[in-house]
Amino acid sequence: MIEQWQRGFVLHRREYRETSLLVDFFTEQHGRITLLAKGAKRVRSPLKAVLQPFTPLLLRWSGKGDLKVLTKAEPAALTLPMHHTALYSGLYVNEILIRVLENQTAYTALFQHYLQCITQLATQPEKLQVTLRTFEFHLLKALGYGVNFSICAATGQPIDAGMYYQFSENKGFFASLLRNHYTFCGKDLLAFEKGDFSDTDTLQAAKRFTRIALRPYLGSQPLKSRELFQAILPHKLKSS
């Protein structure tokens, strides 16, 4: 049994038999973990209203097998208010975490970045694009995606802000005269290195890069959150 309270968030939940739920959590010390919430669907269950996305939780669970049982869950703070585009962006973040994180592997630093990300989505929705790109770069780092944005992979020389570079997966950036989906301006790469997405062109380039970089982790299956976003807010999708 986990004796100490563990901080965590609901990433996703699904029905299990008649009265229970299987809940995917992102926890500070144990990373992503799936727990059985017995009786959580019952009307009088104290878990029914608590197990919601974007609610900071304190958790306890028990069990020795692969599927452990949630024994207690209490809100540590109020649910972060997500609306419209911010809500679907938050669901997107939750979905990619479910898809890419190893089960029961600690990502302590990433947990803090996740907390910062959803807080900013809730409180600063006008900065949504910057918030998402910043989190995606932190996620890639947590996954061990080691790309040097400041050095040319072919020469070992510093990236030139005025030149263009072709991205080669698992190798890095090479000076190139080509202009295609895998080509990036040096000034944008240097901004990536600093985590500076204040420039509009850099922000768009960052979105392009993270989609390329996350593709091997996410696989070919479409993101359900993006499909939902397309169906409900198609006119806003291009800016997210």
From Swiss-Prot:
Listed GO CC annotations: bacterial nucleoid
Pfam families per UniProt: RecO_C (PF02565), RecO_N (PF11967)
Keywords annotated in UniProt: DNA damage, DNA recombination, DNA repair
Family under the similarity heading: Belongs to the RecO family.
Function: Involved in DNA repair and RecF pathway recombination.
Protein name per UniProt: DNA repair protein RecO
Organismal lineage: Bacteria, Pseudomonadati, Pseudomonadota, Gammaproteobacteria, Pasteurellales
Superkingdom field: Bacteria
GO biological process: DNA recombination; double-strand break repair
Signal peptide as annotated in the record: none
SUPFAM superfamilies for the chain: ArfGap/RecO-like zinc finger, Nucleic acid-binding proteins
